[in-house]
Swiss-Prot record:
GO BP annotations, alphabetical order: translation
Pfam families referenced in this protein's UniProt entry, alphabetically: Ribosomal_L33
Record field: transmembrane: none
Protein name as annotated: Large ribosomal subunit protein bL33
Amino acid sequence: MAKATTIKIKLLSTADTGFFYVTKKNSRTMTDKMTKRKYDPIARKHVEFKETKIK
C-alpha cells in the first residue's frame, strides 16, 4: 500500500490565544512550513497562523 501524500497539520495563532485550525497539506509539494492569515475569534481579528505538529 502506498504512503499517503496528505498529512494533517495544526495552524496555531501567533496572537498567543491558543486558538488553532486543523487542516491538510500535501507534504511532497509543500515542503516548507505553512503560514496563513486567518480569523482568530478569541482575538477578534485576522492574524497570522503558523504550522505546528499535531500531538
